[in-house]
Amino acid sequence: LKTMAPSALRTSGRRRSKGVVAAVVVAGLALTGCTSTNTDDDSSLLQTLQERGSVTVGFAGEAPYSFMENGELTGATVALHREIFGNLGIETVEGVNADFGALIPGLQANRFDVVSAGMSILPERCEQAAFSEPEFNYTTALMVEEGNPMNLTDMQSVADSGARLATMTGAIESDYATELGIDSMQVATPQDGMDAVTSGRADVFALTGISLNWMKNNNPDAPVEVTQSFVAEINGVPQVGAGGTVFRTDDKDLLDAYNEELAKITSDPEKYLSIVGEFGFTEEELPDPELTTADLCAGAE
């Protein structure tokens, strides 16, 4: 693998019927109430969760990764967690909703056990938390007004055109904008980004292609379209995108056990697609086995 300076790189089965997703705690209650994780000095988090039989995940409501639908927590990362944690003897997945930018702080504050958001593995994030091995490859896309009147195709075209850009707070696209000198409008959720475009407050909303296409397909009457997905480039350097589950750095036993189960899924394309395919994921999103979390945390391509 070719290496580069960390600042140069920016990275944005069977279903277990007993892997029940339990009630979701609203963000306000979760942020002010008691913590979700209580371990004694002699027990690892893995042991505690196995004894409890449940794991609490932080999520930001970004479809199709982790979101609420008909009162239940669902999505590709949730499906992976049902499978993996179920195989570890942890049968129930509970969710705490939080803004994307509050997920790692919430994890550090013990408000949930792991983050289930398909979060991009970035060097600066690796300084704050531990990541699983990659679960998804990422590409970026743009949501624009129907007809794409500004002919926007990638992040550089947004910068060159002076288009008003919306990005989600804490998402990798915000970093792309900063590095390209774009003063982007920050939004809290994907829905807020689409609303910014449809209301005329923004010309374009940048997010992962899988998320934007999911939104468009589920809002067919919205007067927007989604560009072809692309790999963003900053100063001529392709920005390799891969995401994973986030853990506290102290929870190594849980992370190691999780990665062992994850490898059984990502090494088997048929199994991988049987878990995440219903959410619009294809073999294009299957992680490159040559690209590891260690590489991404170090800033290597």
Describe these PLM feature segments.
Residues 28-33:
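C-terminal motif of bacterial Sec signal peptides marking the signal peptidase cleavage site
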Residues 42, 93-105, 170, 185-199:
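Short helix-initiation/N-cap motifs at beta->coil->alpha
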Residues 35, 78-87, 148, 156, ...:
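Extended ligand-binding regions for polar small-molecule ligands
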Residues 82, 95-158:
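Acidic, polar ligand-binding/catalytic clefts
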Residues 36-40, 172-185, 256-301:
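Ligand-binding clefts/hinges and TM-proximal coupling segments of bilobed small-molecule sensing domains
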Residues 137-143, 220-262, 283-300:
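Periplasmic-binding protein-like
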Residues 119-127, 203-239:
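A ligand-binding cleft/hinge motif common to bilobed small-molecule-binding domains
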Residues 39-117:
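Extracytoplasmic small-molecule ligand-binding "clamshell" domains
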